Each structure stands twice: as structure tokens, then as C-alpha cells.
Amino acid sequence: MHIDSLTPQAPPSGHPPVNGLVLMGGGARTAYQAGALQAIGALLRQKSHSRHFPFQVLTGTSAGALNATFLASKAMGGLNGLDDLANFWSAIRTEAIYHLPSTPLAKFSRWATALGLVLSARQQAAAMDSLALVNTLHKAIALDKIDAALRSGVLHALAVTASSYSSGIHWTFCQTRDGLPIPWSRPGRRAEQQPITIEHLMASSAIPFIFPSTPLWVDGGMEYFGDGSMRQISPLSSAVHLGADRILAIGVGQPQRANLAGQRNGNGRPSLGTIAGHAMASVFHDTLEADVAQIARINLSLNVLPDSVRAELPFRAVEVLSLQPSASLDALAQDHVHTLPRPIVRVLEGLGALQGSGAALASYLLFEPGFIEALMSLGQADVKARSEEILAFFEPHSVDPVR
């Protein structure tokens, strides 16, 4: 990450801090974010009498973009919006997100199921049909409420990222309070002012090989987009560009992959499910902590400069709090994978993705109550374990150009 993309112009001294929320992607795993945010809402209620929505800048990638946009639509309701997100996830089922392409004999035969997958892959370059998710999002997200939250000043900006298969560029689509053009462009990364739609969310959450790409109109032409986690080298950058002084970033990565490492195949060769899960991890989870560390280094560099030098620099320090699962989500998925619809279980079984390290693949697709509730409970427990740190993050102190 470059310093110019990370710490743009410093705000006026003493201005109230702008809180940003960055939500990373990860399919069903992002239910963890809903649990964590609900627990944060409970902490803030206990700490003060304020019920205001705690974030002014919302950015999200993949399923994290769905969460961010849902929250934007509920921001006028204050802290209740965090509870609404948790309730949304509690009601989710796999059939409301995707289904396997079907043939008349699919429910009787694994071969018929495989044939449906092959036909879908040829027609849509994707294994699953995600039309159900379109319907779910239209019912759950009132897009007009986002505009109302922006006009009222409750929100300053909402941003959703997606990766263009057509051009290879990683795009950030921004809907802001002032509606002005978004000024940043970097090699391989662009930003554009657009009202966020369900199509943007489908594009951002189109997991490669799993869900079909989505066409979006951008830069004067139509391009096909897939999951925003692909080629996302700087997940915190858009929140900083949009004015966040303090950023809470919630990922859904794997803390200790070694938890499942001992359950190897007898011949030592990884299954297709293991390889696919490893590939998914490289797409979704390898950039956030590196970005947080880079911000910490830049903050340190700015803070050791003499006051006279800092006063001349058009940069600012940005406070970041990162929250990641404290337990293995892969192992958690292994306990619940058999609750998926039977046709999907058959496919995962054929890929070797029902046990051991292969269960990582299932964790992205497991939109079933047991797994969702376990993820949300983990998010709530992790917030409670760090409650003092989180409450300190939300203290209403003023922000100086360099902290």
C-alpha cells in the first residue's frame, strides 16, 4: 500500500472523529460480523444513553458489502440497526441464497447432480444459481433509506468493492452525502460515484467459480464483475479516502489453520475440497492484517516527526481496530456441514469437503441455522472479551491531524 492511498489530506484540527466500518468478505462466515456488531451495540447502550448509529462511513467487500449496505439502510434507526442485521442473519437459509442447477433426476442421483453442475458451468461459468439471493436482498434492503441516511448526515458514505473480469481493475463504487466525483485512481484500482444497487451487491459477492458474474455499467461501458475480495490489496483504503479517522475492521479469517492440519488424507494428497478451501482463503483473508500493520507503521512514522514537519504534511494518522474470529471457522463448519441440503452435501462429499481441511470450502456455503448461530455467538463472545478496548475505541474524543 502506498502512503498516498492511505493517509490523504488531514482534516481540520479538533473536528469530531469520523468512524468507519470495514467489513471483509467470506460468504456464510460473515454472520460472525453480525454477531460482533450486535454485541458492540449492546456495549454502547450500556456505556452511554446515546442510541445514534455509531459509524459514518461504511465499506464492504463480498458478503461484507451485503452487511454494510444492509446497515446503511437501517442507519436512521440508530443502534437498532445492528440488531436488525443479526435478526436478518438468524432467519437466513441456504435456499434463500443459492441452489444447485437441477435436472429431473438430481435428487436421486449424484451423477445427475454433477451433470447439472457441468451444464451450469458451461452456461454461466458458475456452479450455483444465485437468483434466490437477488430476491432476498430486494426484500431485506430498502435502498431509498440509504439516500435518506446520507441526506440527513447520519451517514457520510457507503462503498462497495467489486473486481472486473473484463478489465482486471478493482473498482470501489461509492454513494456519498455530497455526491461529488470520487477523486482517487491507482494502478489497477479505481473508484466511481454510483448509487449502490442490488446489482452492485451481487457483483461484489459473486464468489469465483461458485456464483455467476454480474454486469455493471462503469466508466462509460458495460463490464462483468466478480467478488470484490479478488485483487483487493488495500481493504482499508476506501474508508480512509472517504474520510474515516477511526476504522473498525471485521474480518472472518482463519486464526489457526493448524487446527485441522492433523486430519490429513492417508496418502497425503489434498482433496479438491482442501485445495478449493485454500484458494478461497487466499482470496478472502490474506490482506486485512497486512493493511492494518501498514497503517500502524505509517502512524508511527508520522508521530515521531517534529511538530513543524507534521504541520506541513497533507497526511493524517488513522486509528484502526481489527477484529477477527478467535476460533477456527473451518472446524466450526465441519460440525454443521451435514445440515446443508442433501444435493449440496453430495457435491461437497464428492469434492472431499465434508471433513478435515476440506471443510473450509463448506464454511463459505453453509447458510444454515446451526452454523449461523455458532458464528454469531463467537462474534459476540469475541467482542465481550475485548469490551474495554472496543469501548475505548468509541470514546468521543476529538481527532487531531496526527495522533
Where are these regions (language model features)?
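N-terminal low-complexity/intrinsically disordered extensions
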Residues: 1-18, 402
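Flexible loop/turn segments at secondary-structure boundaries
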Residues: 28-30, 68, 232, 255-258, ...
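Alpha-helix termini
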Residues: 42-52, 145-150, 304-313
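Acidic, Ser/Thr-rich peripheral helices and adjacent loops at domain boundaries
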Residues: 261-301, 343-344
